[in-house]
């Protein structure tokens, strides 16, 4: 089984997130995508963070594809860092092939994540294009450090077969929606 792991605050979740999930499922040939709603992001302020239960319920509403499984198991683990969560997931699912899914906009700060290089060396990563990040992702510390591990986009369906480090950049339809803009009232919330 091939499972994509798509984590985030989803504060709020919106159709842009659903589009990333849809692209990942299609282009990577995923059997499932685990939409992991995090209790909080250590790199972001919690001032405007909606309650976890609300973000889970909204994520379930937005993620219509039956292959998408919304989860918030990170809260029960009592961990705050993605590297710890992913190590736990991998240890408990040794026969599942996981791919970490992230938006290209997240690459600019990925090197600030705790144990970010360990994440890259443990899981293949699919980076999904986002508006404003199509070219800027090339200058990210992750892509420069692991340039040797880039897998051609045409081979995205076999990314799960590649030993980490391995990553690909997937172009495709992009949504200009952002949770920050929705919270600030800059764009309408299209999650309905």
Swiss-Prot record:
Signal peptide: none annotated. One of its GO terms (molecular function) is nicotinate-nucleotide adenylyltransferase activity. Belongs to the NadD family. The keyword Glycoprotein does not apply. This is Probable nicotinate-nucleotide adenylyltransferase. It is an enzyme of class 2 (transferase). Keywords: ATP-binding, NAD, Nucleotide-binding, Nucleotidyltransferase, Pyridine nucleotide biosynthesis, Transferase. It holds the Pfam family CTP_transf_like. GO terms for biological process: NAD biosynthetic process. Pathway: Cofactor biosynthesis; NAD(+) biosynthesis; deamido-NAD(+) from nicotinate D-ribonucleotide: step 1/1. Catalyzes the reversible adenylation of nicotinate mononucleotide (NaMN) to nicotinic acid adenine dinucleotide (NaAD). Its EC number is 2.7.7.18. The gene is nadD. It catalyses: nicotinate beta-D-ribonucleotide + ATP + H(+) = deamido-NAD(+) + diphosphate. InterPro entries: Cyt_trans-like, NadD/NMNAT, Rossmann-like_a/b/a_fold.
